[in-house]
């Protein structure tokens, strides 16, 4: 967002990039110390002056246009700036009136393409809790970048290829009639897979049959391809139920199989570089000069690896989408894999625009309060079961607190699923997420339900008053109390917060901000009578209530959370 403009900075700026200067500006920890602070020690080394002297020089030279800054203080080596509060209130509320639900958006990404590769479950296997984080973090990054004007391409790079399909085809040939895969595809296919896998361990010839099936599939055999397509379509249909619950949509489902015929080109290009060498039964690119283990491109039996498929995907995406960034949202366990792939991608002859903008966005594990997440039998927890459990727990809470609530099921869905999403996004993604129902569904904690509760409160205040005042009727002076100003300043920062979340690929920056805004409104609501005051005060406070609700709803939407209208 625009910082106050100044002129007449003399020599101090001459060798300083204005972007650097802008990045140095901080928000003081204590509100009494001003609205912005500039740490002069950041210039001390280059200017060969003490921070205190730089602060004095700057204070004398700075001239602000339009009286945007009313006071500048020096504290230690800091310059502290105090904004013109009435001007700030007027600027923020006029912008809200003009932009409405687009408030905080930007066209900074106009004309730029961003590929975001996330979720990516395996066909014919359970869509489990391990896929929650990539799905939720990826979706939020997608929405945030879209809000900033980027053209986003969300890719669900499905695990739909590999030797396991040879086994599934063999199992289905033998016992397909015994299983109802149309009705319950993933559970039934899992049973077939376990059964054929056990048989392979006992009988080498069955394993050979499975390998032959996959070879046939690779060669385009009609029967094997038809079965593979059936398994894939049924799995996607089942995955879609979960995506519908989370309201997530993809622009492409090109997964592993899509690149099966595109890997030969990668291997050819790498062969021409002379860097593809044989080693211990594999074909590798040596990365010892980068202090990394070698990147395995193929096995001697001719089969390819994940790395080869990822390299083929990079080439395809560069050509198809002309991307400005290609982002991968996966677990931190894949950090080395992507470092290797991104290094080898530099050998593919692609423009640096593509190879310099490959970005891995890693995240930590999910743990319950007492360790890793799994059921009593050691099976993984299905994501659909987890989301249904969240909804049913919220229904129980609603029954206890507000049994006559209309649309109970729909509201419980928004709160329960919102709670799961918010819990996932509330901390920096690299930290392991602790999964604890009581914390997550606490309506007074730093949670999704708390933000929804405060949003619903803004709606009920406006419903009670029966109107949203017109901006021209607002007397901005009526919002200069401490609690109102705190909200105005937070709303002013919304666009900047969204940009930071995008730059760092960290939705938690936005999640934390929404908690601060909700808490500020709660405090304002508890200390101020909104309806029934003097008409000018009422109109000003109602408009601020409307603005708060607007930003809470938009911010939650960027995290992938829907707001209920009642609770």
Where are these regions (language model features)?
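Cationic, low-complexity basic patches in intrinsically disordered or flexible, solvent-exposed regions
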Residues: 4
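Non-catalytic interaction-recognition regions
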Residues: 1, 11-89, 100-101, 105-567
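Short, charged, solvent-exposed linker or helix-capping segments at domain edges/interfaces
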Residues: 90-95
């Amino acid at each position: 967002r625009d910082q106050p403009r100044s002129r007449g900075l003399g020599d101090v700026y001459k060798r300083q990039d204005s972007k650097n200067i802008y990045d140095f500006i901080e928000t003081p920890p204590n509100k009494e110390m001003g609205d912005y602070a500039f740490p002069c020690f950041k210039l001390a080394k280059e200017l060969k002056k003490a921070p205190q002297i730089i602060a004095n020089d700057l204070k004398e030279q700075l001239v602000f246009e339009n009286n945007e800054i009313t006071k500048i203080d020096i504290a230690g080596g800091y310059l502290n700036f105090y904004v013109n509060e009435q001007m700030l209130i007027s600027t923020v509320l006029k912008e809200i009136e003009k932009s409405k639900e687009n408030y905080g958006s930007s066209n900074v990404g106009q004309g730029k393409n961003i590929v975001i590769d996330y979720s990516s479950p395996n066909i014919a296997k359970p869509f489990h809790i391990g896929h929650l984080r990539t799905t939720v973090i990826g979706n939020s990054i997608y929405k945030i970048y879209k809000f900033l004007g980027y053209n986003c391409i969300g890719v669900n790079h499905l695990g739909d290829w590999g030797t396991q399909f040879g086994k599934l085809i063999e199992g289905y040939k033998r016992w397909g009639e015994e299983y109802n895969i149309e009705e319950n595809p993933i559970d039934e296919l899992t049973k077939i897979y376990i059964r054929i896998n056990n048989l392979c361990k006992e009988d080498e010839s069955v394993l050979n049959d499975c390998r032959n099936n996959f070879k046939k599939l690779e060669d385009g055999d009609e029967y094997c391809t038809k079965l593979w397509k059936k398994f894939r379509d049924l799995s996607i249909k089942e995955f879609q139920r979960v995506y519908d619950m989370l309201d997530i949509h993809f622009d492409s489902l090109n997964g592993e199989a899509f690149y099966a015929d595109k890997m030969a080109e990668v291997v050819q290009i790498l062969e021409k570089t002379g860097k593809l060498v044989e080693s211990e039964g594999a074909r590798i690119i040596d990365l010892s000069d980068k202090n990394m283990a070698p990147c395995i491109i193929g096995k001697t039996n001719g089969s390819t690896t994940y790395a080869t498929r990822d390299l083929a995907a990079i080439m395809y995406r560069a050509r198809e989408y002309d991307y400005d960034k290609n982002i991968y949202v996966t677990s931190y366990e894949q950090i080395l894999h992507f470092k290797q792939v991104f290094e080898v991608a530099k050998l593919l002859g692609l423009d640096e625009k593509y190879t310099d903008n490959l970005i891995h966005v890693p995240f930590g594990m999910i743990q319950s309060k007492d360790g890793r997440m799994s059921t009593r039998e050691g099976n993984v927890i299905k994501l659909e079961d987890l989301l249904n459990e969240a909804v049913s727990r919220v229904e129980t809470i609603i029954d206890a607190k507000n049994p006559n609530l209309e649309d109970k099921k729909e509201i419980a869905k928004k709160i329960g699923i919102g709670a799961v999403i918010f819990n996932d996004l509330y901390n920096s993604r690299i930290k392991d997420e602790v999964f604890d129902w009581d914390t997550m569904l606490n309506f007074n904690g730093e949670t999704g339900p708390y933000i929804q509760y405060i949003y619903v409160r803004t709606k009920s205040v406006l419903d009670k008053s029966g109107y949203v005042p017109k901006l021209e009727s607002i007397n901005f002076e009526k919002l200069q109390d401490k609690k109102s100003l705190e909200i105005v300043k937070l709303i002013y920062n919304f666009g900047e917060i969204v940009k930071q979340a995008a730059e760092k690929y960290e939705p938690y920056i936005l999640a934390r901000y929404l908690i601060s805004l909700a808490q500020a409104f709660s405090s304002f609501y508890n200390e101020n009578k909104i309806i029934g005051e003097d008409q000018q005060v009422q109109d000003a406070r109602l408009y601020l209530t409307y603005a708060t609700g607007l930003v809470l709803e938009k911010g939650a939407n960027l995290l992938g959370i829907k707001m209920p209208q009642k609770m």
